[in-house]
Amino acid sequence: MYEIQSFHAGLYDSKNAPVLTGIMRGIEREGLRIDRDGKLAQTPHPVALGSALTHPQITTDFSEALLEFITPPTHRVEDLFKQLYDIQGYTLSKLDDELIWSSSMPCVLNDDATIPVAQYGSSNNGTMKTVYRVGLGHRYGRAMQTVAGLHYNFSLPDAFWSFLHREEYSLLDLQDFKDQKYFALIRNFRRYYWLLVYLFGASPALCGSFIKGREHNLQPLIDERTLHLPYATSLRMGDLGYQSSAQESLYVCYNDKQSYITTLCAAITTPIDEYKAIGLQDEKGEFKQLNTSLLQIENEFYSSIRPKRTAKHGETALSALRNRGVEYIEVRCLDIDPFDPLGVNKPQVRFLDTFLLYCALQDSPDTSPEESANILRNQKTVVTEGRSPKALIESFTKGKIPLKQAGEALIKAMRPVAELLDIAHETEEHTQSLETQLAAILNPELTPSARIISHLSAKKLPYAHYALAQSRHHHETLLAKKPSNNTMQQFEKMAAESLDKQTRLEQKNSGNFSEFLQEYYKQYQMCCDK
């Protein structure tokens, strides 16, 4: 049902191993800073961590209390995890009496006013980042922005693309060929990422304070402090999590690079009444949002995966993509693993590599608006009832299929890809990762979401108490083996350099913010016009 139709046999040749050993990976892991009682930290971003605006590895997301750790791109999985360990270990050593929340769904929250928006200083770039977040708060509420996730960045080496380019006798320029193939990967990813939500969803329950005053269909677990759905996998990926009902009417086309850019640019440059009503500035002239369009910038579009290109200073992400093509893809549908101190583990990464390479090699027809609607329905099904024995996945070509049957068939189709990666890396870890996840398909009780519900029920623990206990445990685990003195010194140097860089940016600030914003948005108009 999901088998790759035209597998390139030459990939099995040992001399072609560099075609796959050159895969580049990176992780972005978010985590809320909390006090020892499990409440959201009200303190500013610690100076010892450097500038959240300019530090390359430690920054903040929506809230001043929502940390984000960014590993540099690396070829080796072992190096990836050492980097993530070092970043988190250094950070924890500088947090004084605070912890990092272990889960995707947030700690006990009070009203929106107690959720501090991230601050990035007085430069135009820093002001823009803060105003964007203020706008998110007005549009969706600040509570939704405290949800944490894990992003996986992935790129295949030029050697791989050159190999395919030759095998397929393509007449395209290599970058154009890569763009075409990355968008094909993305289309297949969107067809099948329901499997990742099922396997790695780890937010089946949440603290009642998160949805206080909002309509919902969640049920109490033990008591009203913890709400859940019996067969849920990832409430983070559902309507109550990091999603936007306002964007449900937005159809973004993934059939080629220009269509993707054009549809997103239109959403950024077309005002809508709902956001006009918020207003652009308050009575004091302070900005309430960057614009009144459906999207302030491309980052506001909530998607499971993004095509990416590293942007230059002052360049929009879409301009970078238009000018230089796809560099890597960013997987955005992963929950924090509350059972692991780092929020992710090596077998999961091996599985993701296999899944993404499968998506790259599998035939990938264009996606229609009807299939896109089908994809979203599958996401909602797996989010709310993925572990139900009655859960059905909608295949756009084959109709409704039991989730267990679809998952088993997809894993089977991925096996040749896992074997390919094992041969290239001289390991069995990719095949083993498939077998581990196949077991979770056949037995839903092995999934992280089921394990969490089982633990809460058995111990009669509220969600917030459980997540706080995990946070304390992970804190002690990571601090027990601090990074080396040399690594600590490197991070201290990075922090100092980032603070200096922010100061220099603020000193050379030119023009007022309104003019800066006007110039910045001209780039989107150029993207629309092309």
Swiss-Prot record:
Pathway: Sulfur metabolism; glutathione biosynthesis; glutathione from L-cysteine and L-glutamate: step 1/2. The keyword ATP-binding applies. It is an enzyme of class 6 (ligase). Gene3D superfamilies: 3.30.590.20. GO terms for molecular function: ATP binding; glutamate-cysteine ligase activity; metal ion binding. GO terms for cellular component: cytosol. GO terms for biological process: glutathione biosynthetic process. Pfam families: Glu_cys_ligase. Keywords: ATP-binding, Glutathione biosynthesis, Ligase, Nucleotide-binding. Its EC number is 6.3.2.2. InterPro entries: Gln_synth/guanido_kin_cat_dom, Glu_cys_ligase, Glut_cys_ligase. Belongs to the glutamate--cysteine ligase type 1 family. Type 1 subfamily. HAMAP family: Glu_cys_ligase. This is Glutamate--cysteine ligase. It comes from Saccharophagus degradans (strain 2-40 / ATCC 43961 / DSM 17024). The gene is gshA.
